[in-house]
Amino acid sequence: MSDAHGIARDQLRAFIERIERLEEEKKTIADDIKDVYGEAKSMGFDAKILRKVISIRKQDADERMEQEAILDTYLQALGMIPAAETEDAA
């Protein structure tokens, strides 16, 4: 029975150590990304907009179009952008 506990303990330790290594790698990558944003900012680019562009690029084209349409609808409802002209108005 003690062998079973030893095996489980070893497996648990291995999982924990793998997770810790991955967390360290994740932090290193996050620091690298932060450095790239800083570099872009020093070249005159807006980091907030860069993040938005990256977010948009991750989206599926159909999903992005749907979100843009909903956003336009909301902005029109709030009077923040003019309503799209319909064919009936012509």
Curated annotation (Swiss-Prot):
- The membrane-spanning stretches of this chain are none
Pfam families membership? GapR_DNA-bd
Write down the InterPro entries for this protein, in alphabetical order. GapR-like (IPR018753), GapR-like_DNA-bd (IPR046367)
Disulfide bonds, which pairs?
none
Give the protein family.
Belongs to the UPF0335 family.
Classification via HAMAP family = UPF0335
Q: What is this protein called?
A: UPF0335 protein Smed_2680
| Organism name | Sinorhizobium medicae (strain WSM419) (Ensifer medicae)
